[in-house]
Amino acid sequence: MDIMRSVVGMVVLLAIAFLLSVNKKSISLRTVGAALLLQIAIGGIMLYFPPGKWAVEQAALGVHKVMSYSDAGSAFIFGSLVGPKMDVLFDGAGFIFAFRVLPAIIFVTALISLLYYIGVMGLLIRILGSIFQKALNISKIESFVAVTTIFLGQNEIPAIVKPFIDRMNRNELFTAICSGMASIAGSMMIGYAGMGVPIDYLLAASLMAIPGGILFARILSPATEPSQVTFENLSFSETPPKSFIEAAASGAMTGLKIAAGVATVVMAFVAIIALINGIIGGIGGWFGFANASLESIFGYVLAPLAWIMGVDWSDANLAGSLIGQKLAINEFVAYLSFSPYLQTGGTLEVKTIAIISFALCGFANFGSIGVVVGAFSAISPKRAPEIAQLGLRALAAATLSNLMSATIAGFFIGLA
């Protein structure tokens, strides 16, 4: 029954996308079918197929090892505030977001910058981009951007496409925006992992977002024009560093900006949510609903969607609440709310944890529309009106991509 519910959930998400399509007759079954099969195949290999699961587990161990090196840098600055004694002192509640998550973002951003400098990232992106281009029958610029989102966030994507943006057709531009919103950056992945989200789920979700973003981009806005973008030399930075030290330093400074942005937004939004909950609770108290909150409203509204995706009805309220927080605020705040359920152990089923982890894994939220429109408009002012028109539809496509990955994850974990 649960397996069939997951299948129905996939069909429902595809049906929603079809209803939102701007040109239903031009939908390419070749591209859409291949993207869906590839998204399912990646999920099956990484979550169900034993050799694939083993590979993901080893990769997760590697990420944990990388995080331990990040702790060395944090300990040098903050001392015992990042050590195990904090958990003893505070009876298991010694996790401090500012000292554990934010330094990891800085470290990993610097590491990624180094890997770009020595050519590892460029080689990997070229190989994967070529595979996805041929498998999905998409343009080179679309595959290039989609694969790059594994490592870079939506803030960096505009800089990558800057040399080509004036030659990109409307569909390619839409796909680029969708890919950025549907994905997470490598540096942010470490941040989520620092809050207890299983790394193997984050790795799988990151890869599944590549075909997932293209799948829903091509349903909501089918390709109707041939690509005009041709290039030989792919550039990953507008001003590439000239030395190993410069690469590390510039990456660290970029990481600092990201960490500062994350800290500022999370601090502000957590406070705003508390204020909104106080208002809702006060008004609700007049009618006998003193415990009403923004989270409970999201939970009631989105619980049916969470259930059709495969979450048990007993947990659907929680899942719906977290999905709502992610959409209305951002994924970091949603993961922060999810974190206590990951620390307690045994309160949620493995399948539920997986579905929620995948559903929250992406930049798709209303705030991202402003980020994307502002960033893309800055590099191509003449296309600003067109970019603004694509924002809300791109958010819908990216959200559906995240929910599809979550539904597929629930399907395969239900089989295990």
From Swiss-Prot:
The GO annotation for biological process reads: nucleoside transmembrane transport
Q: Where in the cell is it found?
A: Cell inner membrane
Chain ranges passing through the membrane = 3-23, 32-52, 105-125, 173-193, 197-217, 269-289, 353-373, 395-415
InterPro entries named in the record: C_nuclsd_transpt, C_nuclsd_transpt_met_bac, CNT_C_dom, CNT_N_dom, Gate_dom
Q: Which domain of life is it from?
A: Bacteria
Could you name the Gene Ontology cellular component terms for this entry? plasma membrane
- Positions on the Cytoplasmic side per record topology: 24-31, 126-172, 218-268, 374-394
For this UniProt record, give its keywords in alphabetical order, as a comma-separated list. Cell inner membrane, Cell membrane, Membrane, Transmembrane, Transmembrane helix, Transport
Q: Which Pfam families match?
A: Gate, Nucleos_tra2_C, Nucleos_tra2_N
One Gene Ontology MF term: nucleoside transmembrane transporter activity
Q: Which residues lie on this side of the membrane: Periplasmic?
A: 1-2, 53-104, 194-196, 290-352, 416
Per the record, membrane topology reads: Multi-pass membrane protein
- Name the job this protein performs: Could be involved in pseudouridine transport.
Q: Which PANTHER family match?
A: SODIUM/NUCLEOSIDE COTRANSPORTER, SOLUTE CARRIER FAMILY 28 MEMBER 3
Annotated family: Belongs to the concentrative nucleoside transporter (CNT) (TC 2.A.41) family.
The protein's name:
Putative pseudouridine transporter
Q: State the organism named in the record.
A: Escherichia coli (strain K12)
User: Its gene?
Assistant: psuT
